[in-house]
Amino acid sequence: MVYRRRRSRSADGTYTRRRRSSGYRRRPGRPRTYRRSRSATRRSGYRRRRY
């Protein structure tokens, strides 16, 4: 539903472009931190446990 509405608003161009940029930048930043933090914890725990 959100995607459909966003695509429909493409006529504006400005709102879609600005919102898309913010979403794209925020999307990679959030998951990257979570993934990195989880990876580091998992690796550290696995290594420490194995060691």
From Swiss-Prot:
PTM field: Probably phosphorylated in infected cells.
Lineage top rank: taxon: Viruses
Stretches the record annotates as 2 X 6 AA repeats of R-R-R-R-S-S: 5-22
GO CC annotation: viral nucleocapsid
Compartmental location: Virion
GO MF annotations, alphabetized: DNA binding
Disordered, as annotated region: 1-51
This protein's name: DNA-binding protein
Species of provenance: Orgyia pseudotsugata multicapsid polyhedrosis virus
